[in-house]
């Protein structure tokens, strides 16, 4: 059977509730559970020719910035997919059979900062188990965070403090890797959202700039 997203062949199988066959491969379903939007599930680093393959050999975080529509989220999604694939654990379900199974790590999350801000606002106005601190801790402590679209939120002292708290938690934690995208350069981020945030990102991240016109309009 062929995955409807990435096109790879995978064995026929019935989903857990038995209602219908799978239409996506295990990797694409896993990525979707980790928060990656459907439209980015098939993103591949093969789409980029800028030497980012060396990023996988480093332990550095990454800050990707550029204008609207230059492919920042697509690139970040490709890095997430490739990182999960390269760290997968392969094993044989039965030593007497040649069939190989694979387990993908779960210590990855994809989220946009506007989504985090929305969750925090919702926690203040409803009776949920989530609070500001639990939301920040969730994304601040996961080993691999793919944080999309920082700087898109309207700047306020409160949201600046939330963003700084999150970045600081990731910067000071052990073995925490972060990939961040923004329409703003670090200088612009400092002007609009505070120097502390921009300084911490510069400290922890390699910087990649994507240039060009809006690909969505071409």
Predicted ranges, named:
Residues 1-54, 207-208, 212, 218:
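A short, basic N-terminal segment
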Residues 77-85:
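GG-anchored amphipathic helix commonly corresponding to the ABC/SMC/Rad50 NBD signature/C-loop
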């Amino acid at each position: 059977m062929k995955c409807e997203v990435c096109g790879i062949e995978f064995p026929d199988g019935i989903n857990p509730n038995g209602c219908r066959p799978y239409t996506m491969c295990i990797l694409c379903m896993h990525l979707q559970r980790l928060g990656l939007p459907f439209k980015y599930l098939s993103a591949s680093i093969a789409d980029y020719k800028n030497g980012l393959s060396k990023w996988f050999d480093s332990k550095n975080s990454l800050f990707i910035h550029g204008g609207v529509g230059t492919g920042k989220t697509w690139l970040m999604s490709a890095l997430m997919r490739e990182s999960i694939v390269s760290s997968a654990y392969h094993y044989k379900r039965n030593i007497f059979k040649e069939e190989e199974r694979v387990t993908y790590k779960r210590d990855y999350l994809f989220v946009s900062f506007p989504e985090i801000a929305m969750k925090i606002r919702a926690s203040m106005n409803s009776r949920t188990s989530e609070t500001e601190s639990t939301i920040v801790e969730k994304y601040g402590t996961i080993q691999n965070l793919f944080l999309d679209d920082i700087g898109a939120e309207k700047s306020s002292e409160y949201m600046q403090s939330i963003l700084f708290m999150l970045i600081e938690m990731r910067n000071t934690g052990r073995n925490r890797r972060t990939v961040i995208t923004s329409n703003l350069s670090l200088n612009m981020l400092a002007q609009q959202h505070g120097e502390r945030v921009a300084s911490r990102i510069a400290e922890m991240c390699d910087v990649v700039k994507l240039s060009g016109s809006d690909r969505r309009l071409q």
